[in-house]
Amino acid sequence: MRYAATILFVALTGCSGPQTDAKMQSLYENKKEYFSALVTGADCHIEKNKILWRHEVTKSNTACLELLAKVEADGIGVDPISEGIMVFPSSRNYSSHRKGYIFSAKALTPLYPSLDEHPAGLQPYQMGFKKIDEKWYITYEYAN
């Protein structure tokens, strides 16, 4: 019985879902220089329609991978819809709700005041956004 309780606890903590907006915004604000370096510096060479994952270590992407570690992210890539740069936070959960960061020169919609709960009217695989800084957004996607 004791083992069943432990397994249930581990299963539930693994399905806790993404971080809150407040935690994500705080991380962004505390590490803003590293987030900016990811998208504006010469260290990250991101191919369109491809994600650079932190475990893909080569000499040419070492500096970019160090920046990803500093912002607690697992990957970076170009979002094909907004053409912005998407930063994928490290997540150790199995939730159907995904959150991330996106840097976009274009204004992104739909905007929501909070992404802590599933936004009303947002369809599966459609992204919702919360603006946290000039050209920076938190993204939310429900992956049915």
Where in this protein do the model-derived segments appear?
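Generic detector of low-complexity/intrinsically disordered segments
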Residues: 10-14, 40, 110-113, 117
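Alpha-helical interaction segments
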Residues: 5, 24-25, 126-127
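Sec-dependent bacterial lipoprotein signal peptides
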Residues: 1-13
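N-terminal export/targeting and maturation segments
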Residues: 15-77
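Residue-level detector of functional hotspots within protein domains
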Residues: 1, 21, 122
